Design a protein with these regions (language model features):
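Basic, glycine/proline-rich low-complexity segments that contact nucleic acids
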Residues: 1-3, 7-16, 22-179, 187
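Single conserved hydrophobic/aromatic residue that forms the stacking wall/gate
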Residues: 190-193, 197-201
């Protein structure tokens, strides 16, 4: 099972024994099944979920035709989730936050928040340089390595250097559903999850 949701922020709840539990508040608006794929017709089993409202003027004609063929209202996000067995969903079916029960263990997949071009201190938690005694190497990358054998003058691939931070696919596993609020379409998940639009499975 899987469902799409949007992270609203962090909060905290008290357990019955008095423990304070930090939680991520996930808004799970109704998900609509946009397509169902099977081994017989597509070569694999999958279900395509639609999430979020969107105006038709923002859609291309091929995407608009896909919604018209399925007989569903246009949605902003479409995500496909592969299944091991033949799906039991039907096109147009609606999924809500209550597909996961309290105490259930889940995985969360999404794109982490992009933070732009960052240096090695922020990106890789490197140490700062000396702050005084004439040093000008405060936040620089510093040495990329001593002379290498075989000619030197090169930088090994994978060297920790400045670059794009965030904005990549992230999977966080074994999170626990602490509470489900079906009246407000909210799901509270133990510990922080780093994405805005999340696929909960």
């Amino acid at each position: 099972e899987a469902i799409l949701g949007t992270k609203l922020g962090m909060s905290q709840v008290f357990a019955e024994n008095g423990d304070l539990i930090p939680v991520s508040v996930i808004e799970v608006l109704p998900n609509v099944v946009a397509a169902v794929k099977t081994v017989e017709s597509d070569g694999y089993n999958a279900v395509q979920l639609g999430y979020g409202a969107v105006k038709e003027k923002h859609l291309t004609k091929p995407v608009k035709g896909q919604f018209e063929k399925a007989g569903i209202d246009p949605v902003k996000y479409l995500r496909e989730y592969r299944l091991a067995e033949k799906p039991s969903y039907t096109v147009g079916q609606t999924l809500a936050a209550d597909i996961f029960a309290e105490g259930e263990i889940i995985d969360v997949i999404g794109t982490s928040r992009g933070k732009g071009f960052a240096g090695t201190i922020k990106r890789h938690n490197h140490q700062r340089g000396p702050e005084s005694h004439g040093s000008k190497n405060h936040r620089q990358t510093a040495s990329l390595g001593a002379r290498m054998s075989g000619g030197g003058g090169k930088v090994f691939k994978g060297k920790k250097m400045p670059g794009q931070l965030g904005g990549v696919r992230v999977t966080v596993q074994h999170l626990q559903v602490v509470r489900v609020d079906t009246a407000r379409n909210l799901s509270l998940i133990h510990i922080s999850e780093p994405t805005r639009l999340a696929l909960i499975s």
